[in-house]
């Protein structure tokens, strides 16, 4: 079978990525070999997996390996694997387009700062395109396992926006990538240099990486090729080796291989689990959140092996969703080789693995968070900045570990004048005032809005610490986290706020007296706000502000209503309660005004100001401006 010569254009995103890599990754050029070896390893993993159901794909060649060969005379470098290979359509799709989620978001995050962009590009997974960092032309010859020799293809590009594809004859299954090196890249023709890069980045690859064997020629005073091939890596799966035989550098290199992340992980755990389920786990906590963490199509999960045979990437059933950022490998001794994603959802062994992995990850986080070592605590601070919002999901998702997760949460509070989320609930409880039996919090869109909330005034006056919640996930968190250490979590914006022993009898008597004294004014204000406010009353919770809005017990807060509406969901139309500060001049003026426009304007302005103070939106901003202007005139 033959197909015509074709010249095609790269997808626009590929052109952009090629340009970025060539100009942003020049300081770390050697990663191209790591990426190409990683791809070759993946190709052999896929062949092993498909050959379980169809052994004929091995074509009597089960000695899977990667070969790397430099030709100084031709200035070329070849990377060959005998893995699954590609058909013509697969070559066009895999080498000409980026078929993954989050691509648009990735390009939006690029800043022009070479160091930051290099980190992002590495995280995105430069893969095959990294070849163009050192090559001005790349040729790929490939045949998919199971196809005839004349169905092989040659793909070629100079990285200039186009690529050609031709039909060729190729007896060998798999792929050969030939890099035609740019001027000045002769360093990558050195066998010694190539072996160092392989041992640095790819020593853990579980199949042999072979290079032409060289020996010293004493007569010629130089290395010469013997005609044999030798393995230059350990060629054993890292997780199958004893922990005592693995260096930190090897653990980090393996992480970079599976995560496509050039940064070192914050922590890792490597364990062999025996009992009801037998498996090995090697789990990593990354130092940086992936750019598409919040993308609904984000691929999460661990690499799954069964008895050292690769089964699938992104096995998300092996971890609860709130740990979707964890990277690593699970190798099970119990699951069948033909396990499917559907079977994983029903398997008791997988449930045991998921629970075991979750406990190990939480143990790593606890070790960092509770460490006496400042460097370890700094790692937890980094973790929280990157993944804290996702960890909050765990309180509702993982009831069995809910208490452990709650202890790991960090918040901003009124204890410090900073938006940094560094206070644990354990810290908060340890600082509670004598007689305090509740944990108080306020929710808002931003830290500035939270710390400026009128609801905090009485708490500041009494020196009571309040947790400032500003993440979108916080309202969801509160629907599950009702108490901590026996202390109920209470919103300061609740209308029935009870300070218990923190409110003295004199204050309670004063509140009752104010309610009686202001009854006539309050009743008139209720008439003005009929249909907008559920109730109007005076309060002693305010010291500086004239008014605030609170929610009745059992009603949804205004903040949560706004979040639901922003998400396009229907929110119950619960009306707030307007509370007035009887000591504020704007409120006192109400006593002197008869029913009419002036009284109505002042009441509506007090309501609208309270709504704005909590981050709400006015139904009619123009009318608000007119009322304020009339008050100022």
Curated annotation (Swiss-Prot):
GO MF term list: ATP binding; ATP hydrolysis activity; ATP-dependent protein folding chaperone; unfolded protein binding
Region of interest: A: 1-341
Chain intervals for the UniProt region annotation (B): 342-562
InterPro entries, A to Z: HATPase_C_sf (IPR036890), Heat_shock_protein_90_CS (IPR019805), HSP90_C (IPR037196), Hsp90_fam (IPR001404), Hsp90_N (IPR020575), Ribosomal_Su5_D2-typ_SF (IPR020568)
SMART domains: HATPase_c
Compartments, record wording: Cytoplasm
Any one of the GO CC terms: cytoplasm
Annotated keywords: ATP-binding, Chaperone, Cytoplasm, Nucleotide-binding, Stress response
Origin: domain of life: Bacteria
Pfam families, sorted: HATPase_c_3, HSP90
C: annotated span: 563-633
Subunit structure: Homodimer.
Function: Molecular chaperone. Has ATPase activity.
The family this protein is said to belong to: Belongs to the heat shock protein 90 family.
PANTHER family: HEAT SHOCK PROTEIN 90 FAMILY MEMBER
The protein's name: Chaperone protein HtpG
Organism of derivation: Cupriavidus metallidurans (strain ATCC 43123 / DSM 2839 / NBRC 102507 / CH34)
Lineage start: Bacteria, Pseudomonadati, Pseudomonadota, Betaproteobacteria, Burkholderiales
Gene: htpG
